[in-house]
Structure formats: C-alpha cells, structure tokens
Amino acid sequence: MELLRSNLSRVQIPEPTHRIYKHECCISFDTPRSEGGLFVDMNSFLAFGKDYVSWNYEKTGNPVYLHIKQTRKSIPEDRPLKKPTLLAIGVDGGFDNNEPEYEESYSIVILPDFVSLPFPSVELPEKVRIAVDTVVNAVGAERKEQVAAWTAEKKLISEHALTLQQIKSGIVIPPSGWKCSKCDKTENLWLNLTDGMILCGRKNWDGTGGNNHAVEHYKETAYPLAVKLGTITADLEAADVYSYPEDDSVLDPLLAEHLAHFGIDFSSMQKTEMTTAERELDQNTNFDWNRIQESGKELVPVFGPGYTGLVNLGNSCYLAATMQIVFSTHSFISRYFSHQSLKMAFEMAPADPTLDLNMQLTKLGHGLLSGKYSMPATQKDATTGDPRQEGIPPRMFKNVIAASHAEFSSMRQQDALDFFLHLVGKVERASNTTPDLDPSRSFKFGIEEKILCPSGKVGYNKREDCILSLNIPLHEATNKDELEAFHKQKAGKGLEENDMRSSDEIVRPRVPLEACLANFASSEPIEDYYSSALKGMTTAIKTTGLTSFPDYLVLHMRKFVMEEGWVPKKLDVYIDVPDVIDISHMRSKGLQPGEELLPDGVPEEVMESAQPVANEEIVAQLVSMGFSQLHCQKAAINTSNAGVEEAMNWLLSHMDDPDIDAPISHQTSDIDQSSVDTLLSFGFAEDVARKALKASGGDIEKATDWVFNNPNASVSDMDVSSSNSAQTPAQSGLPDGGGKYKLFGIVSHMGTSVHCGHYVAHILKEGRWVIFNDDKVGISTDPPKDMGYVYFFQRLD
C-alpha cells in the first residue's frame, strides 16, 4: 500500500473530457478477455495488454494501472435460433450475435514489478477509489454504436400522407383475386391510394417481378402513394406503403382511413405477400449472395498467420474486404509488419497512439498477419457447427482513417473503391516525409492522354492514378445467342418470379476483361474542345495509355451506372477475368517523331465561359416563392441547375450557412483548399487544379472533366518538355516493369447499390483461394472471379 501512496501523484481522477480506454489495447487487439487481461494507465487512461504495458511504463513512467479481467460464464449451448425479421446483427429482430456473458474482476497493479492490490478495498487511498470507480463506470472510448440495419433504415411518415386527396370513383377493392389493370400479373400488385388503380410493381434486376405499370401510372398522374396488396393485415404498420416522389417505403398514419375509402376492412385481411424489406431479406439469400459467399459449400475454416478475420463493426464489410487484400501486398506487409515492430511504432507515436495512423496500421498489420488472433474460438459457428474465430475489431484503425470524413466515420455502408482511394491518399500524405517507405506507391502508375486536334497537332495530359476504372461494353458480350434465346424463352413462357429460383436459369451477359481494357484504350471524341491551334471550339480525339506499370494493378468495374433520369442501376453482368493478363500494349509512347504539339495556353474568356451560370427559370420560380435573388442563384448553381425541387432542398438546408449572403464569386481565393488537395491527389498540378475548380464552380467531378478536356491549361507541366523529356517512372518515384499480371484478389459486392448490401474478399494465398467474409475465413472452392467489383493483380516480373 505504501508503494501505491508514494505514486499517488501519477494517478488522475478522470474528467468528463477524458477519453477512457478500457475495452481494447491501443497497441494490440488484446482485451479484458485475453489471457493476461487489460491494464488501464491511471494517468493517461490508455489501455494495454499484458505483453505491452511495460512499454508504456518505459515510455511514460506511469506506474499505476487498473487491471481488468473478464472470465466467461457458463451458458447453455442449445439456445433456440429465431428467424430474423430485420437485416441487422445484434439488435431486436435481427440476427442473433449469440454473445456469451462474462464476469469482470478488477485489481490495482503497480509497475515495474506488477505488484497487485485488490479492488474494491477500503484500504485504498480515496483518490484511487474515486479514479477507479470513474473508470469502471465510464463508457469506454472504443465503444461504438453496435451494428444497426445493413441497408434498411427506419421508415418515416410520408409528407404526402396527411394531405392525400382521394378520388370518389366508387371503386371497391375485393379482399382477394387481384390482377393488374394493364396486364395479367397477379403478384407484386400495388393499390394506388388516390384513384384505387391496381397495378403491378417494378421489374426486378433479373427480369422478373412486375411490368412497371404502377410507377408508370405515377409518372402519368403524379398520384404519390401506393400500398402493396397482400401486406395489409390488422397490424397496419407492417403494411408496405411506397411514396413515389420520396422514392422510399414510408409510414401512412391515415392508412386505415385511406383503405376504408375503397371498402377495405384491414382487420379481416391476411398477409399473402412479402413486404419490400422482407423481399430484400429474401433476395439477400439468393443468387449473388449465395454465389459470392459460397453458401451451401462446405468451406473449411483456416487459421494462422494471414488468416485472421475482421469483426463487422456495423456496415464495415467494405473496410474489411479492402484491408484484407491491402495487407496481402508485399508493400504493406513490409511497411507495417515485417520491417516495423509494434514497439517501434509505439515509441514513434504521439502521446495518444490511438490517434496515430502509423501506429494503428501497424497494429492492424500485426493483428492480421501474426496469427496471434487467428485461432479456433471456444464457440463454434452456430450455423455450421465448424470451429470459428472471433476475429479482431478494427475500431481504432477505422476511427483514425475515417477522422474528419463525414461518410467513413459514420455507421453507414460505403463504397469499397472509395475507401481504397481514401486509404491510399491518407497513407501517401502520412508518408510525405519518408516517400521511400510509402507502400501506396506500389499501386501508383502514370496515365498519359493524347489529344489529337483536327489541325493535326497534338496535346498530352499526364497524371498519376492508382486504379483503372473500366466501363463495361455490354455489346461485347460473348454469349449473345444464349442471351437472346433466354429472353425469348422468358417472353414466350411468361416466367414468373417463382419459376426462376434456380441460378442456372439466369443468363447474364458475359463480357471479357480484355474488351473492357480495349475500350479504355480506344479513341473517343471530345466535344467542345478548345483548340489553341485553331483558336476555337472543335471536336478532338482522345486516346489513353499508361506511362508506367505498377507493382499492383487495381481494376475497378463500373457496374453502377445512371439510367435516364439519373436513376442508379447495377449492371447485371459477368466479367470473364483470366488468371493472367498482359497490358503491355497499353503503354503510352509519348510524343512521336513528326508530331507537333498544340500551342500553349487557354484564353481567359474560354475559362470564364466554362463557369456555371444559374438557370433563369429555376431562379425565377424560387424568387416567386419569396426567396432572395442571390440565394436562388446560389441554389441553382450548387445543384447544377438540376431543377426547382433540388434547388429548393439545397436552399432549405443551407439557409444558416455563414456565407449564404456572400456575393457569388469564382475567384481562386474562394476555392476550397480541400478540393484542391483532392485534385492534387489525382496527380494534377496545383495551378491546373485551381483553374479547373474555378472553371467548374468548385465541383470536383466537373473539375476533373475540365482538366481532361483542356490538356493545355498549364504551361508549367504540359509543355514540350513534358512530352519530350518527361521524367521516367523511376525518376518520378513510380514503380515500373513488364505488363504481365496475375490475379490475386477480388472484392465482390452483393446488393443494388455500393452504399448497401455486403462486400466479401477472395485472396489467392499460398496457391489456394481463400474467402474473407468479415470474421469468417475459409478455403474457397469456387471463387466468383466473374462477379468482382474491384480486381487486384500483381505484376509477374
């Protein structure tokens, strides 16, 4: 006790502003459930596993720790499993996470000799008792909100429900025997709550479902709400009500009244149809989900170094799939595992290592690659009975990598490709003082775009990138005859949803990866291109090639496209991807003998003409509603003149902006530096980035297009020397080599949008394919090579 009293000055009583870590070691993935428990520094409130707490004592001199140990309670192993009603984990109605219960014990430990004192104890100094009680009762800094619904969010009351006008048509809806008013469909039927029309729903992605008559009726009449027949029961909240203008499932608090208008007694109705959410749950177990996750196959669990699963933190599968592949590359393994120990990273880290990207990447690398946490758990998989591993939760890494990013720091599902690009950018910036150690460089390569003007002169635009984003030319499908026969069969037999349950019956276009690469390298016209040779606008021809070949080639398949009306759609397509590809023919050769470069410079008036101007009709309509002219112009510009409704929504959400009354300006000084930084990360020069943002009103996507369409925008980096005597890849720090690559990683996506569904990784390790599905790791017997969203290749030389 005297030893403790002599160190009281090193004990702090936590303030409300203190971040208290007590669930996970900040250096490793040890927890209170680990064999050695967890040690909380009673001065900094950081937590350490038993193997690492001495490092903290050596670094800080803090001797007093709260030791937390959790021991598992015995529980019955034959708990009945309930069928989930919500696409979620660990919440009421969702999938049971089957978490065991633990008993927690505490003691005070004084380093360096690990002298232990019991807690609670009246003999402890009051300061220590208060400090420990505060830590024990506090919510740990690591603890995040548990996993909510993967895709479905809580339904909101429709803004049209309370003011819905119903037509007195005398229509009485029978309790059964329904049929679409415009075709012979008898399932997936929707009752329009305005006029009583019964119409079929949308056509599904695979060609099944309805014939779109309900949504077409809305487009013709603008009648907003419809309820799905077959989902109406005495529990009206369970009925599936859809709002077309809000484009979502909604609640109608007056549904009973609206149904009574058509003679429907909801209390006598019985449920015969699945709701949209239930159908989504059902589809999540269908073809894509089963194929990509290899459901139904006996996957052999695999354990050991490099085979550690990642716990899903709640819609974090995009992060898990990406990081498993990233930490299968030699560059990341070398940087954060082979050549950097945990102790080395901790010694270099600031006072709070939980906020240090280098520390947390090293922690994640050692967690995934050491094999320490890849061992069979005492609990077996509830569905297969096979040994399972608990996996490691990448909470601290996610907090650091997502810091200050509105989307990645949320619990919402994200695009795995966006996350990969974000990761590469963060790692590159963190390595700016030691570029030789930057592992993200292994993904980088040079791109050169050649612009051929009708004058015969050429321009070259060079930049760096870390992905090749490929359009999918569906017209290059190799199974056109099979597709045609399939669609004729469907049309002839009228195949319904229940007739197409077998995945073998679904025929999709098969497009070779070679066709996607050829499409990328093919010539394409550029409309409204300003030619400095002709001194006017014209149509030029652009061809694209690579100036270097990276160590790791990342190919992104553009499966998500926009249909007419800016409706997102996922292409239902297979990509035939060989194990080995050769892109040698895609190397760009630069300025060729006999070619003459376009003169430098773009007139200021051309740049000014590219600046966005508010649509006068949109502005006039908003002004007539009582908004100021300036505010309306800003709303139109910031929504790219998309329409009155979009501009109105922007206005309502930005009325409190501090600069809402500032004059509209396109000056360079008003350009957001973060937007400039984003374009810099794409490999553009700063002066080009600023010109592009100025010309596009600050819109990054439009600015990128502007750069591509104006390759002569900068004298500094697009002159003769840039084409004639440009740096070699080696001189610019880019890796380079031959054009042959071997497939080693696939990130696959299941779902209708990159922002919902689920991501899974398949990785070629030690000559065999392995599936990484969050914390489930097993030998893959049928990797979905033709269903990938992002493909990772390693250069063979």
Swiss-Prot record:
Protein name (database record): Ubiquitin carboxyl-terminal hydrolase 14
Catalytic center residues: C317 (nucleophile), H758 (proton acceptor)
GO CC aspect terms: cytosol; nucleus
GO molecular function (one): Met1-linked polyubiquitin deubiquitinase activity
Enzyme class: hydrolase
Binding residues for Zn(2+): C180, C183, C200, H213
Tissue expr: Constitutively and ubiquitously expressed (at protein level).
Described function: Recognizes and hydrolyzes the peptide bond at the C-terminal Gly of ubiquitin. Involved in the processing of poly-ubiquitin precursors as well as that of ubiquitinated proteins. Involved in seed and embryo development.
One of the Pfam families matching this protein, by short name: zf-UBP_var
Domain of life: Eukaryota
Reaction equations catalysed: Thiol-dependent hydrolysis of ester, thioester, amide, peptide and isopeptide bonds formed by the C-terminal Gly of ubiquitin (a 76-residue protein attached to proteins as an intracellular targeting signal)
Family statement drawn from the similarity comment of this UniProt entry: Belongs to the peptidase C19 family.
EC code(s) of this entry: 3.4.19.12
Disulfide bonds: none
Keyword Zinc: yes
Ranges of residues in domain USP: 308-796
Domain UBA: 613-654, 670-710
PROSITE patterns for the chain: UBA, USP_1, USP_2, USP_3, ZF_UBP
Zinc finger (UBP-type): 156-266
Organism for this UniProt entry: Arabidopsis thaliana
Any one GO BP annotation for this protein: protein deubiquitination
Keywords per UniProt: Hydrolase, Metal-binding, Protease, Repeat, Thiol protease, Ubl conjugation pathway, Zinc, Zinc-finger
